[in-house]
Amino acid sequence: MMILTDKDRRTLTLRWRHFSVFSVLEWHRLLALRTTIFVVEQQCPYQEVDEKDPLCWHLELLHNQQLIGTLRVVPPGVAYAECSVGRVAIDSNYRGLGLGRELMDAALGFCEPRWPQGVRLSAQAYLQAFYESLGFQTVQGPYLEDDIPHIEMLKRFG
């Protein structure tokens, strides 16, 4: 696990981009990180890339310009009536540092002014307490998604 000093934290950058502005190399790096986590680490032999990505806003977390985390925001009407957050991924060397919370805080700040009806997500069940700490409530589940236990959660704004 990496230890981030205050100086290191100042070199962290959050960057929002729509799929349409990624270069091929940048998109490849993002997919490589997601695939490492969701396919290799979790031993989940299912399709990582889907038809939603081209419609999404993607948040990148960079440390010294190296991609170490990402998530995507899916607009309302694509997966759910509300917008949704998914594919939250942190490089294994940077876990346990609160960076997942930083990504989620940024995502909620991005979503609330654009889609004030709230945010829905399909969370891996073991992360329920984490998402509850961000104000999400379980609305369905547990159920299997790609053979991994998940729960559907919702956060209303206001």
Model-derived features with residue positions:
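Conserved beta-strand in the GNAT
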Residues: E60, Q66-P76, A81-A89
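N-terminal, polar/charged subdomain of small-to-medium soluble alpha/beta proteins
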Residues: L4-R10, T70, R87, D91, ...
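Short amphipathic alpha-helix that is part of the acyltransferase structural core
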Residues: M2-L67
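Conserved GNAT acetyl-CoA-binding A-motif
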Residues: M104, C111-Q124
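Conserved acetyl-CoA-binding loop-helix of GNAT-fold acetyltransferases
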Residues: I90, G96-G109
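Conserved catalytic-core motifs of GNAT/GCN5-like acyltransferases
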Residues: S122, E132, Q137-E152
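A conserved beta-turn-beta hairpin within the catalytic core of GNAT-like acetyltransferases
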Residues: P75-V85, R95, W115-Q117, D146-H150
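A short beta-turn/loop motif at secondary-structure boundaries
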Residues: V49-P54, G77, L144-E145
